[in-house]
Amino acid sequence: MKTVILAEKPSQAKAYADSFSKATRKDGYFEIQDRLFPGETVITYGFGHLVELDSPDMYDEKWKQWSLAHLPIFPNQYHYHVPKDKKKQFNVVKRQLQSADTVVIATDSDREGELIAWSIIQQAGADQGKTFKRLWINSLEKEAIYQGFQQLRDAEETYPKFEEAQARQIADWLIGMNGSPLYSLLLQQKGIPGSFSLGRVQTPTLYMIYQLQEKIRNFQKEPYFEGKAHVITQNGAFDAKLDPNETRAT
């Protein structure tokens, strides 16, 4: 029986390997020997996302050229691909996953970690006929890692987080792939050259920066007053200043 542990990145895989009795580094993975996993066990890893959503032109050649007539872009199904610079590592991971009896998802314990893991597993065609477990920890200390592997969860418990993350990923794709050409083409019609990138997080953040810059640019100096007092008590005298942030109604 073979167990494959899927980490998110090389440094994470190394931390896992160091927590076991013996680990041997190979090309793109580690071979593990430990009483916790008596059978053949390997740790392999991604480089973060090994799989990306296809660009519009990969669905239809007409979407390669921006045109208002081609908007909106809504594929019937969403497809993924492995970027060229990540194919070597993906193929390493794919071979390990396909030969596994049990897969332990050990990416980061959050939605994005679920997305990274299941995107790789599904793209590798290794999402059926296997036992899936989930490592869920918040520390890379050796003791915490080992304890986490002793208390693996069923992967189905956290699978909804993958679905949430994938929905967010597709929504971001739709906003970017439709909003960017739409606003760029409309601005070009008004004589403003160039292309403009829109994003769910990027655009509101940019607007917040703009608002702050406008406040700085339009700032007007105004006179203000400070309340000060020289206080004399039986124990001595001292100067005091009113702090408006410390005043309280009584």
Predicted regions and their residues:
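Intrinsically disordered, low-complexity regulatory segments
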Residues: 1-169, 173, 177, 243-244, ...
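Prokaryote-biased recognition of long, low-complexity C-terminal linker/tail segments
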Residues: 168, 172-248
